A protein has these predicted regions:
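Catalytic cores of nucleic-acid endonucleases
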Residues: 116-185
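Short hydrophobic-acidic sequence motifs that mark active-site Asp/Glu residues
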Residues: 92, 111-115
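A generic secondary-structure signal
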Residues: 64-68, 159-166, 193
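Phosphate/oxyanion-binding active-site loops and adjacent basic polyanion-contact surfaces
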Residues: 53-61, 88, 148-153
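Short, solvent-exposed loop/turn segments that connect beta-strands within catalytic domains
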Residues: 101-109
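A short acidic/basic microdomain associated with nuclease active sites
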Residues: 66-102
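Interdomain/boundary linker segments immediately adjacent to catalytic/signaling cores
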Residues: 1-80, 261, 284
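Non-catalytic C-terminal interaction segments of nucleic acid-processing enzymes
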Residues: 169, 180-284
């Protein structure tokens, strides 16, 4: 699971190829990951670090999910392209579970898609000894990391919607949003609504202990959930992969909906009824 050690390791690796000015903000002649809340300086967060963090967290997630994928006879693959469902070289899947270990995939080979919205969550000070020293959790600084950032949530939601509406093949693939922070109170009901509608299967935090203060660990209907350990993550993923799911969305009169339900109900068992209902929806 995500820890402060992962964040310190990121900075130690990144500083070998980047200047400190490209990784941290300068506040009162010192370098911080984020501006502390007690300071009111005008600072500019270096945009260059966003790409560095993005690449690092995508690799971290691939490593984290490697064994879980293999337990399900699948491969964890970064940067998956599948043009038929809207995953282009410009907008690939950050991570996907696939039946082959290739970046270019057919829709049938993609069994699970992850959109990764992770980042540096805590605050760090770059010391005179050229070390990165923890100086406060996310409640002590002015940044909005990971799922606490509204535009990150909106981008993840928008990409998921595009996957759902781009083709019929994209309607069968589960989508999970990965983060390493809580969500804001304003998104508690929104994430539940999105998951109930089937657009996204779950928003997940892989950071069990981001603060000792009160924070949202899960939403009322579990659309967002913080996992405590890898075993629980693996159990949830196995459950998702073992569920035969279809995304469907339609707006119609009750009479028309009732007719579809009536026709589907004539099938011999629940699975056939579900398949028939989906087929009828496609004909609308």
């Amino acid at each position: 699971m995500w820890t402060t050690d992962d964040e310190v390791r990121f900075f130690n690796d990144a500083i070998r190829l980047n200047s400190i000015e490209n990784l941290m903000v300068a506040v009162r002649n010192r370098y911080y990951a984020f501006q502390p809340k007690e300071f009111n300086e005008t600072v500019v967060t270096p945009q260059a670090r966003n790409g560095v963090i993005g690449n690092a967290t995508e690799k971290w997630c691939k490593d984290f999910f490697f064994d879980i994928a293999r337990q399900n006879n699948l491969y964890a693959v970064n940067g998956v392209i599948c043009r038929s469902i809207g995953l282009t070289p410009q907008t690939p899947a950050d991570l996907a579970f696939c039946t082959t270990n290739n970046k270019e995939q057919s829709a049938e080979n993609i069994k699970l898609i992850f959109e990764i919205k992770m980042g540096i969550v805590n605050n760090y000070l770059y010391t005179e000894q050229e070390e990165f020293s923890f100086c406060g959790d996310y409640t002590t600084h002015k940044g909005n990391p990971s799922l606490l950032r509204s535009d990150s949530m909106l981008k993840a939601i928008g990409k998921s919607v595009n996957l759902r509406v781009d083709s019929l093949a994209g309607k069968k693939i589960p989508i999970i949003i990965l983060g390493n922070s809580p969500i804001t109170r304003g998104y508690k009901d929104k994430v539940d609504c999105l998951c109930q509608s089937g657009v996204i299967q779950k928003f997940v935090s892989l950071y069990p202990n981001p603060t000792i203060r009160e924070h949202i660990k899960q939403s009322p209907k579990n659309g967002f959930e913080t996992f405590e350990n890898e075993r629980k993550v693996a159990e949830y993923i196995a459950h998702i992969l073992g569920s035969e799911m279809n995304y469907f969305s339609a707006m119609m009169h009750n009479n028309q909906l009732g007719k579809l339900i009536d026709i589907a109900s004539r099938e011999d068992n629940d699975e056939l009824k579900g398949q028939k209902f989906i087929e009828l929806l496609k004909q609308i």
